[in-house]
Amino acid sequence: GAIATDIVQSEGGAISLSTLATVNGRHPEGEFSVDKGYACGLLLENGGNLRVLEGHRAEKIILDQEGGLLVNGTTSAVVVDEGGELLVYPGGEASNCEINQGGVFMLAGKASDTLLAGGTMNNLGGEDSDTIVENGSIYRLGTDGLQLYSSGKTQNLSVNVGGRAEVHAGTLENAVIQGGTVILLSPTSADENFVVEEDRAPVELTGSVALLDDASMIIGYGAELQQSTITVQQGGVLILDGSTVKGDGVTFIVGNINLNGGKLWLITDAATHVQLKVKRLRGEGAICLQTSAKEISPDFINVKGEVTGDIHVEITDASRQTLCNALKLQPDEDGIGATLQPA
């Protein structure tokens, strides 16, 4: 590797190297060094980049306009500002990184404790945990816009005010949503627009999900939800979107739903029979069913599974004008379902 000492990097200067190099110097933000596979304090901008080789480490790197960090080893405490890009390849790992407005993080390896404070993160078949999404930032699991990666996984995701998370393919396990939005798309089949790892890219939600005040989760039809427990607090909204299903009947299948003052929306096209299959549905709250069906029958909606609590039902048309709201779910005598009854 190259050897250079006492470098003075002026504002806007570009440095390109790998962790095989031996260099040190200073820039407007402080001092930097690269030695024996360890890099610290670099400022990368204007086309400058650092490649962190397998078995090597980099930390406290700043990525600015057109600066890049390419990681096959490990990295931590990276700050990605506008125009900067962090790429973690399979086998690489990143921790405690901050992605600010205009910054980009592309992950195919592993990441933990990432703060998205205005930037964008795409998980391309990698694994991330304890990611925080807020302040206008966007997190995407399973896509780069051209291909779907069904092997990706995110755990313990937090989506706060102004944050948005999209699950295009892969698994979301455990999430807390407070003031943000999470969208699970319907599973996508291979077509002319997407390349997928298999014939189909599954979308899966598992573990515990909490929707707190002003939080929303929108789930496309066909996503796998049976291993999830979703709790909807006051001010939270869970939307199960079956509007793509044509025909008279729509069946939504979920694991457990706890309504603690929140709302569950069931969106249909023109279905005349709607079934919600759950392991358990309990608590106090409202189910709002949206349909463009011309007639509403007494058996329009039924629930299969354990049902307890005080759950009211409202039926609206496609513009969400109320058709009927004096309804509630009445648990069956056998305790394994519920039907629609006058409130």
Predicted regions and their residues:
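Short amphipathic beta-strand/extended segments with alternating polar/hydrophobic composition
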Residues: 25-27, 38, 77, 115, ...
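Acidic Ser/Thr/Pro-rich low-complexity disordered segments
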Residues: 21-34, 146-149, 188-200, 244-247, ...
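A short, compositionally biased
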Residues: 27, 141-143, 212, 261
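Extracellular beta-strand/loop-rich repeat segments of large surface/secreted proteins
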Residues: 131, 173, 178, 182-336
